[in-house]
Regions:
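N-terminal secretory signal peptides that target proteins for export/translocation
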Residues: 1-9
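Short N-terminal alpha-helical targeting/association segments
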Residues: 4, 19-21, 35
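Bacterial N-terminal signal peptides
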Residues: 12-26
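Boundary at the C-terminal end of the N-terminal hydrophobic targeting segment
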Residues: 26, 30-32
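Carbohydrate-interacting regions of secretory-pathway proteins
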Residues: 33-309
């Protein structure tokens, strides 16, 4: 796979969130949340970073989230459609595979971003996914969405998403591919819609950052494992090799402007965060798992989880 061309518990997040345009801000090496009072940020006190200890052990076997027959346990949320509605059958099962398909879109994506949510949220677990990209991107899909999909983890409850919301507030494990000539981005990058993470002891606010993962040609199957340990650490792995690691996933506590030219008022965002009075309240300890649709077809033949107790 490493060739050169190459989501238990009753936890439920009640926040809404949108993909944010994340801008840089000054930060202290010892803080996971930065304190800053201005018109573009909620007034918070920093949270000190704590030592991250590896969990004591693993409990249980791998359990399938996708049963290979139907979408039992999964619920779609397509932009501009109500929760549970998938009018163009974007997410379907064909030949034992969970397919993200656009054959009813008439070659026009029209920014109808979608997510297929597993109904149970999770906190500490290993997530194993086998997938491949196929076919061609829809003609009006964004340039960055070619050979691009995602695993959204620590995500918001889809029932709290707005009708026009593009992505759930979450941590995105970006699934990528490349063309036969190797043109494309490395696999298993991280993006942070409505969130931030800590890297090297510092709050990291750019929207996406690279991994050392391989480039994977379109049409080729690849298996990846995502190690998620609550709010402690998240690791992206290919063939047992860690290609990206970061800590303390958390909601972005700045008043946002949303990607794609959409605006969200300060009052709306404050209403989302009304139960968040302390910096610790913004730390993400778990949430939903979802599979993304961004305009390029992708197939999954295995989606399974191993919970960590």
């Amino acid at each position: 796979m490493l060739r050169n061309c190459l989501k238990s518990g009753s936890l439920k997040l009640l926040l809404g969130g949108l993909t944010l345009v994340l801008t840089g801000l000054s930060q202290s090496n010892s803080f996971a949340l930065q304190n800053r009072s201005d018109s573009n940020r909620l007034d918070l006190t920093p949270v000190a970073l704590t030592k991250i200890d590896e969990p004591a052990g693993q409990t249980g076997d791998w359990q399938p989230l996708f049963n290979g027959k139907d979408l039992t346990g999964w619920t779609p949320k397509i932009r501009f459609s109500k929760l549970g509605e998938d009018p163009l059958k974007t997410f379907r099962v064909e030949n034992g595979m969970l397919c993200v398909n656009y054959d009813q879109y008439e070659d026009k994506f029209k920014a109808r971003f979608g997510h297929l949510f597993y109904d149970t949220p999770f906190s500490s677990y290993d997530l194993r996914v086998e997938y491949r990209f196929v076919g061609k991107q829809l003609s009006d899909g964004a340039g960055w969405a070619k050979y691009n999909s995602g695993l959204m983890i620590h995500g918001q409850d889809p029932a709290t998403m707005t009708l026009k919301q593009t992505f759930p507030a979450s941590i995105e494990v970006q699934l990528k591919s490349c063309d036969p000539n190797g043109k494309g981005t490395v696999n298993l990058r991280c993006c942070t819609p409505g969130t931030n993470v800590v890297r090297d002891g510092k709050l990291f606010t750019p929207h996406c950052f690279d991994s050392t993962g391989p480039k994977v040609p379109v049409g080729e199957w690849i298996t990846v494992v995502i190690e998620v340990r609550g709010n402690e650490v998240i690791r992206h792995k290919v063939d047992e090799e860690v290609v990206l690691e970061y800590q303390q996933p958390q909601l972005d506590n700045r008043i946002p402007e949303v990607m794609n030219g959409l605006k969200v008022s300060e009052d709306v965002v404050k209403s989302w965060y009304k139960d968040k009075s302390k910096p610790e309240d913004f730390l993400l300890t778990g949430g939903t798992i979802s599979l993304q649709s961004e305009s390029h077809p992708v197939e999954f033949r295995r989606v399974e989880i191993r919970e960590i107790k």
